[in-house]
Amino acid sequence: MGLKNGIKNLIVYGSAIAIIGSGFCFGLNQASSEVETVDNFSYEDFDIAAHRGFSSIAVENTTRAFDLASQALYVDYIEMDARLTEDGKLVLAHDDEVFAPFYKNNISDMTYDEVTDKSFTYYSDDIKVYFDNLFGQDGKTIINRLSNLNGITYNVVGLEDGLEFCGDKKILLDLKFDDNVIKFVEALEDIFELKDTSNIVFQSDDSTALLYLKTIHPEWFCSILVRDSKDLELVEYFDGIGIRKDIVDEEFVKAALDNGKLVSIWTFRSIDEVNKVATELGNNCDEVLYITDYPDLVFKHLVKNYNDK
């Protein structure tokens, strides 16, 4: 019985991958992958963070994704992920594993030059995003963007190089410590110790590592990322908190805001998710930072539907 179920699940999963890769479902077309026009709005109404850059249009954590986000007036923050190479340098990538045809390796096992000199191939396997948007608002656009990114060749860039493409946007720098805290902090210090960090939020879901960073650099703005409601209390040790979208609680958010904390919500990949959180937050829905792969769609929807809260 277990084998049959496993085969069935494999067929379903494989079919979904094929559909996403084809880009033909429900009349999807190339035009729907372009950035939505956002006009006639006050860009101060809602705070938006472009997750890993404009990652629904360009490969995440690349200079093109950052450049696109930097040009969008409605984007307030650009989020990016930093991790260590084997020789202790910081590059921008969410996952340690990288892929190319007939090749797979880990960034942590490669030197900075090896990582940044090689081209890799991007593959998206986020089936949940596909199914969540089959019948949802802006679903065609979201699914089409997802399919158009598959198979694109890209380059991993260093942290300093990536920041050059962010213009005057604020930065959410997600720190992938991976149990290498001391070496990671030293790499951060090499880059930021003599620089103005007033527009940078250092964030991580590793509370121990982030507290160490905050202890030795109290002047750096640090935000804890939480995915479980039992960890919300960690906010008292940091300057801000990033809350996973499915554990948002209006009472907690209001208290955090009243205490001067930055509150961000992650990561929005459908309009239905935006509606659920904005409804839960009520009058505070315009006081938080929305982190999303679809900054154009999310901003436009929020302004049109929740601007009177």
For each feature predicted by the language model, list its residue ranges:
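Phosphate-group recognition and catalysis centered on beta-loop-alpha active-site segments
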Residues: 2-309
